[in-house]
């Protein structure tokens, strides 16, 4: 039995080999490989992820401990928690650093962002500091129309960007009238005369009224025609054109004193009486007519005269009375209003004794002839 038992394994193996050969089936051969390293699998997976997300922008990783509020929300939060609903820039910094330790421990770069958001967003208003309150910097407040800028009072979600459109809601931008609107002026009548010791006739004040209305439009019944005269180039051109159409008839009656009677007839400005310390020079009181020749009409005007009670003109103290000059001849005037003086036949001259004599009078130059009147002014 021992021999049989010893030969049994060989028989069993031989029998197994015979069964395999007789049956014709072969066992499959499987090649076993070692598992790959985990680092290699992660690197391959990372490359695939990079290939898929190659065109996308990489999202900035969130910093640990940073609050989820925007800078606008931080500023609005600090202003809302202040007592006066306004804070300076330093007060905003102080509130943020006390409430959120992240901004206290990190660098100060966020302060630049706070300043930019204050100046670039319309929801914040700069308020100047009052003179009585010492300190540095202006105040910042939240716009009244931007108080509902955040949804349901939450500083995490903000609505559409606020735009300031209506300037009438702010006291600093309120204007009563536009700067380009015409100025409405109403002045009372000047009670006194324009010049001392002289009275102005009513027709003269009525004639100068249209010129003053150019700069002072009438806005109330208090506006009268006796306003101060304001002249410009347009009014003077228009006034000169009206003078060519009709002769001026303005008159001012000066009253020097109660005893002396004087009259002044002219078309221009007014002269006030002046007290001279010298002797008086006599002059004729008769007006000398002279004419203007205009392209379409011929105007007759009277020369301006000023008469005193004793028919003398004021002169210096070292001069002697001079006799009246003869009347001027009627001379034509060119288109620009220049007239050559007439010929004086007898002018008073000084002799060797210092007295005035009527002989050897000097004559003024004769009337210019031809076209020289347009270029040579009267002497």
UniProtKB/Swiss-Prot annotation:
Q: Which domain of life is it from?
A: Eukaryota
Q: Which GO terms describe its cellular component?
A: nucleus
Q: By its UniProt entry, which SMART domains does this protein fall under?
A: FH
Chain residues forming the annotated DNA-binding region:
66-160
What InterPro entries does its record include?
A: Fork_head_dom, FOX_domain-containing, TF_fork_head_CS_2, WH-like_DNA-bd_sf, WH_DNA-bd_sf
Localization in the cell: Nucleus
Region of interest: Disordered: 1-65, 239-265
Q: Where is the composition biased (Low complexity)?
A: 251-265
Which tissues does it occur in? First expressed at late neural tube and early tailbud stages in the hypophyseal placode. Expression continues in the developing pituitary at late tailbud stages. As development progresses, expressed in the mesoderm of the branchial arches. At stage 38, expressed in the developing thyroid and in the pharyngeal endoderm.
Entries under PROSITE patterns matching the protein: FORK_HEAD_2 (PS00658), FORK_HEAD_3 (PS50039)
Question: What keywords does the record list, in alphabetical order?
Answer: DNA-binding, Nucleus, Transcription, Transcription regulation
Q: Which GO biological process entries does UniProt record here?
A: anatomical structure morphogenesis; cell differentiation; regulation of transcription by RNA polymerase II
Listed Polar residues bias regions: 1-11
- Major location, coarse class? nucleus
Outline what the protein does.
Transcription factor that binds consensus sites on a variety of gene promoters and activate their transcription.
* Name of the protein: Forkhead box protein E1
Please report the organism this UniProt entry assigns to the protein: Xenopus laevis
What is this organism's lineage?
Eukaryota, Metazoa, Chordata, Craniata, Vertebrata
Q: Which gene encodes it?
A: foxe1
